[in-house]
Amino acid sequence: MAKEESIKMNGTVIETLPNTMFRVELENGHVVTAHISGKMRKHYIRILTGDKVTVELTPYDLSKGRITYRAR
């Protein structure tokens, strides 16, 4: 069975939560809870409040996501 395509959206980190979780406000105004992807964790990429990020959302649960990129 093939994996479902994830939805990629841009947003801004508005709050830092425990356990490398973040509250991200998407461009369309929705607020989601997101965690860091494994490669970002491996390369020690730090994310701070106010950073512009790219978030992948699954079509099954649009309230949770994975941060895959931090814009400079």
Swiss-Prot record:
The record ties this protein, via Gene3D superfamilies, to: Nucleic acid-binding proteins
Keyword tags = Cytoplasm, Initiation factor, Protein biosynthesis, RNA-binding, rRNA-binding
SMART domains, sorted: S1 (SM00316)
Which InterPro entries does the entry link to? NA-bd_OB-fold (IPR012340), RNA-binding_domain_S1_IF1 (IPR006196), S1_domain (IPR003029), TIF_IF1 (IPR004368)
* Membrane-traversing stretches: none
Q: Which Pfam families match?
A: eIF-1a (PF01176)
Task: Tell me where in this chain the S1-like domain is found.
Answer: 1-72
For the keyword Protein transport, the answer is no
Please state the span of the N-terminal signal peptide per the UniProt entry.
none
- Compartments it resides in: Cytoplasm
One example of the protein's molecular function in GO is: translation initiation factor activity
Q: Which SUPFAM superfamilies does UniProt cross-reference here?
A: Nucleic acid-binding proteins
Coiled coil regions, renumbered to chain: none
Q: Name one GO cellular component term.
A: cytosol
Q: Which PANTHER family match?
A: TRANSLATION INITIATION FACTOR IF-1, CHLOROPLASTIC (PTHR33370:SF1)
Kindly state the subunit structure of this protein: Component of the 30S ribosomal translation pre-initiation complex which assembles on the 30S ribosome in the order IF-2 and IF-3, IF-1 and N-formylmethionyl-tRNA(fMet); mRNA recruitment can occur at any time during PIC assembly.
What does the record give as the function of this protein?
A: One of the essential components for the initiation of protein synthesis. Stabilizes the binding of IF-2 and IF-3 on the 30S subunit to which N-formylmethionyl-tRNA(fMet) subsequently binds. Helps modulate mRNA selection, yielding the 30S pre-initiation complex (PIC). Upon addition of the 50S ribosomal subunit IF-1, IF-2 and IF-3 are released leaving the mature 70S translation initiation complex.
Q: Which family does the entry's similarity section mention?
A: Belongs to the IF-1 family.
Q: What is this protein called?
A: Translation initiation factor IF-1
* Source taxonomy: Bacteria, Pseudomonadati, Pseudomonadota, Gammaproteobacteria, Chromatiales
